[in-house]
Amino acid sequence: MTMKVAEKDVLVHCHHVTCSYGDSAVVSDVNFTLRRGEFAGIVGPSGSGKTTLLKAVLGSIKPVHGSIDMLKGLRMGYVPQVESVDWNFPVTVLEVMMMTRSEKKWWPRITTAERAAAEDVLERLGLGGLSGRHIRELSGGQQQRVFVARALFHSPDILVLDEPTSGVDVRTRHEVLHLLADLHDAGMSVLLTTHDLNGLAAHLPRLICLNKEIVADGSPREVLVPDVLEKLYGAPMHVLEHGGMPVVLDHSENPMVGRFGGKAV
């Protein structure tokens, strides 16, 4: 059941949420609150329920138990995994932007006002002049920016992203991280999923550690620690501090600990 919350700073509140596929619980008894202006990441191993929980927040699946309460009139902008997109689909950047118009018939004529609004969002995200380009012709970082631009087209209250750095190179990952940080600095609330502990999660203000249930919830310094990570991944994990940030190594990488110039946490 989804209800509306009254507190103006609370955007989403998950209350004892359980989601199942058949008889198998994928997410179990999850509780967390996301407030306006927060930047939070849901982290965990493959199959931990990250995407399922995100879909429940988006309203595309219903919890079998518990409730998800949302601010009345909450607008969400969703960015899917880029890996899930068929790049052979013959569309331009502008046409991708127009796919948000779900209330209209398929492939309607693009009005002058809609084109101008789309161009404005693209310009703000560093994509000015690319609206007529085929989406496949763009770099990985540009493609991800296009989907973020599409999510921002209708001025959402919160940006929701599923694995925004999955399958991208280091340069694109940095571009995405800086883009999201800039949007957050401008006042956007952000909720994302990621399995990228060092490249993305360690840079976020808040991490919700999920393995079917919430294992920990806090800052990277609070949750990227060996005892929490072992509960989360079911295997020993080693953590270093390097440049003032936690660096997570799995058990197989422990022999390399002394070569990083950092100290164990």
Labelled PLM ranges:
Residues L159-D162:
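Catalytic Walker B motif of ABC-type/P-loop ATPase nucleotide-binding domains
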Residues H134-L138, Q142:
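Conserved ABC ATPase signature
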Residues L58:
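Helix-to-loop junction immediately C-terminal to a conserved catalytic motif
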Residues V225-P226, L232-V265:
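ABC ATPase nucleotide-binding domains
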Residues V170-T172:
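Helix N-cap at the start of a conserved alpha-helix in ABC-type nucleotide-binding domains
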Residues M98, T112-L130:
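Conserved ABC ATPase "signature" region
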